[in-house]
Amino acid sequence: MLVVAVRFSIIWDILFMSDSKLATKRKLKQEEAKGQYYRFNHPSDHRHWVKVMPGGVYATSDQEIIHTGLGSCVSACAWDIEMKVGGMNHFLLPFNNQFESQHWHPQALLSDSSRYGCYAMEVLINRLLSMGAERERLKFKLFGGAHLMGYQSLVGEKNVEFVLEYAKREKLNVVAQDLGGAQPRKLLFDPQTGQAWVKRIGFSSAHAIKQDEELYQHSIDKQIPSDDVELFQ
């Protein structure tokens, strides 16, 4: 009888789940299959941990820890404390060469490179709105954009300039930031409380982060499909 009751409860939840929540769950499964994030059981924590990869966006209402590694990329963490939903993105601006990155400026929000950053921010915000968050209640924390050696130094700087300009223009409630600097970071985020933990790591330990970001940068397609973002009021 207990098994039957549990199964009925699951079916009931599915039948009466809103279309937007069902769409969000389907989207999350597609993104996990594409490698945008990975979920796993932490050996010393009862919660699931979710690692967001470069180019990924993840939002949840579950008791989970979201984490990532950041070199020149940036991450925005956002949450609605009343609805207990939150999420994280992980992105950089794609530049074809050093000349392009040198001549880009943060007010150029309509450029191809900026459109990619805008897309990453919009997906995160709209994902949370689809889960019941209110835009006026959303709070943000911004991380990353390290000035790494060589060409990547410019990329990190431009990523920081972009995310700060975007937050200013969109009037986002940014309550904390840890941007720039010369070292990569490891970032942990509790999406229900908004608490975040940052650890700076040495370059000898950051090879995997740099490799992931380089692979991501080479794979970026700057033509963002207009029908990939659903807007919620």
Curated annotation (Swiss-Prot):
Catalytic activity of the protein: L-glutaminyl-[protein] + H2O = L-glutamyl-[protein] + NH4(+)
Work out whether the entry's keyword set contains Signal.
no
Keywords assigned by UniProt, alphabetized: Chemotaxis, Hydrolase
Q: Which Gene Ontology MF annotations are present?
A: protein-glutamine glutaminase activity
Primary role = Probably deamidates glutamine residues to glutamate on methyl-accepting chemotaxis receptors (MCPs), playing an important role in chemotaxis.
Q: Which family does it belong to?
A: Belongs to the CheD family.
Q: Report the protein name in the record.
A: Probable chemoreceptor glutamine deamidase CheD
Per the UniProt entry, what species is this protein from, by scientific name? Vibrio cholerae serotype O1 (strain ATCC 39315 / El Tor Inaba N16961)
Q: Gene symbol?
A: cheD
